[in-house]
Every structure is written in structure tokens, then in C-alpha cells.
């Protein structure tokens, strides 16, 4: 399994949905980064289940335990281990899934690859694995903010067909956190909540789009050819459970424009800094950040595990039906926001360290 991510700032996540716990080991974190357990807990609380009626009813406090790598509120430069223990496990809810495959879930492919799987809550394929990513992302955010003033903010842009008009240059964390669906447009947020409520009552699920902006990103992050910044961001974000699409800047809509319409023209601002008039490139050109805001979007499919009867097969290939039990999100989007933020922060933090190591080692 590919459980490790990153180059200089590396994370390895561990644990299963209904095992003893989940967590992360972070290697390559610089020393003397100021971070409190409360900073990590804040991000985990945004991700945790049971926080509202439109998320899974599983009740977990997701309390983080910092096992190593920190002392007196600062990082030591040694491996950081963060553990979150599972409390509200109900493996009996998944007993039927020991033999029967959930449509569009990882059950069948895990069996095909490994010949064995933890069917209790999906095991390693569960979104509970992302706890380690979000915890590591909290530290990456601190490094980015303290070293370069970078701010990473995600929000729900669309739920099924309900879409919000949001300015990524102006959106604030307070606006995002002002409602349970994490859409900074209050009117659209209410429409989204009503749609998720209706879907939940129908024992079904829906998907949507998370948009994320990284502001004040320094120029020069990323590298040709295979380590282009947008390629690294795409891999990171699409490694999240249920993520089925990724675009940056103008994305697929840019294919409808001509070069003259799409190109971001340059100018020099009043401080002498070279800027672009528009930002259809999404803050990245030639795989390298250009100093403009990085704007990306991630598409998340409807949750695979639903309560409606579906045709499927068991491990023997025999036809059957499954109406899944257990506790599941009718829509993953509200809880996916901190996950997307975390993966973006991890990539930017890793590339910030790599840029300093390669290009600024001998500069004054």
C-alpha cells in the first residue's frame, strides 16, 4: 500500500476505521515551529463525524494525542507521531459486508488485490484514514503561515446542482465555518442543507465540488517536469476517498477559449512586482507557482454506502441485493473541506522546503 506521501515533508498514515485508532507519523518537519495541540484539534474537529445532522451520526471526539516530536509547544525536528483512538465503533453493522460487495466501494477491488480485507467500516479505505492527513495538514499550515504568510481556505462550491458564486480572493475562514455545510454563501448554504436533508431521509447520497484557494504563495514552488505543482496537487487531492475529479484555474472551461482569451497578461504593480491581470492559470505556470492565488476544485462522488437496495454479488460471485446498514455521510462535502485543505497544505509545505533546499541554499 502507498501509505507515505511527500519528499522532504513526509507523512505516513496508519490505522483502520474500526481498529484501535488512526494517526500519522510526520518526518522532515523543521524544528522550532510553534504549534499547540489546540491547533491540531481545531482541524480535526472540522473533520470529525457527528458534528451536524447532515453528516454521519457516528460519535467520535477525535481527540489527538501527540506522542512524539514536540516539546513545550514547538517541534523538535524529530518524527512527530499523532494518534487518535477510535471510540464509537460498531463493527456488527458491517457483518453482511464481510461477504457482500458494496457497489462502487473498495470492497471488491481490495479483495481482488490482497485476497483479504477489513470489512469493518471499510478498514483502510474508510475516510477515517484522513484523520492523519488533517492532523499533518494542521502542522503544514503552521509552517506555511509562519515561514511565508500562506493561507489555505477550502469551501463547498456545489452540492449536486446547487452552486454558489464565491470570490476565492475574498473568502474568509469565518464565512466558511458560519454554517454546517461550509458554503460561505449563506443563502446557497441553506439550499444545500435542505437538499442533503432530503437525501438523508431518502437513505441516499449526493456529491459535489470543493473549491480551495491558497493565498500569498511565494513564486517558484514546483519543478518541471514530473514534479509540476499542479500535478502534485492533483495527486494529493485525488488520493482522498470519493474524489473523482480535479481542475485548477480555468480547468475544463478553459478549453472553450482561444489563446488570446485565456492567456493571463502581465503587468508590474505599484510595488514593482510582476503580476497577472487575470488568473486563469490558477496561480501556476509551467508547473511553478507565479505568486498569484492558487485556485483549484475537487469533485467528490456520492457516498457509495447507502441504505437503498442495490444489486450486487457476494465473494462467490452469486447475485444478491444489499441495503447497507451502518452510519454514513449522506454527502461527504462538508467534511471533505478540511481534507482538501490539508492535502493542499502538505504539497505546498513540501515544495516550500524543497525550493529552499535547491534554490536558496547559497543565496543571502
From Swiss-Prot:
Pathway note: Metabolic intermediate biosynthesis; chorismate biosynthesis; chorismate from D-erythrose 4-phosphate and phosphoenolpyruvate: step 7/7
Keyword terms, alphabetized: Amino-acid biosynthesis, Aromatic amino acid biosynthesis, FAD, Flavoprotein, FMN, Lyase, NADP
Entry GO MF terms: chorismate synthase activity; FMN binding
GO terms classed as biological process: amino acid biosynthetic process; aromatic amino acid family biosynthetic process; chorismate biosynthetic process
Residues that coordinate or bind FMN: 124-126, 286, 301-305, 327
InterPro entries registered for this protein in UniProt: Chorismate_synth (IPR000453), Chorismate_synth_AroC_sf (IPR035904), Chorismate_synthase_CS (IPR020541)
Cofactor(s) needed: FMNH2
Binding-site residues, NADP(+): 47, 53
GO cellular component assignments: cytosol
SUPFAM superfamilies membership: Chorismate synthase, AroC
Cofactor binding description: Reduced FMN (FMNH(2)).
Subunit record text: Homotetramer.
Family listed: Belongs to the chorismate synthase family.
Function: This reaction introduces a second double bond into the aromatic ring system.
Official protein name in the record: Chorismate synthase
Species name: Acaryochloris marina (strain MBIC 11017)
Gene coding for it: aroC
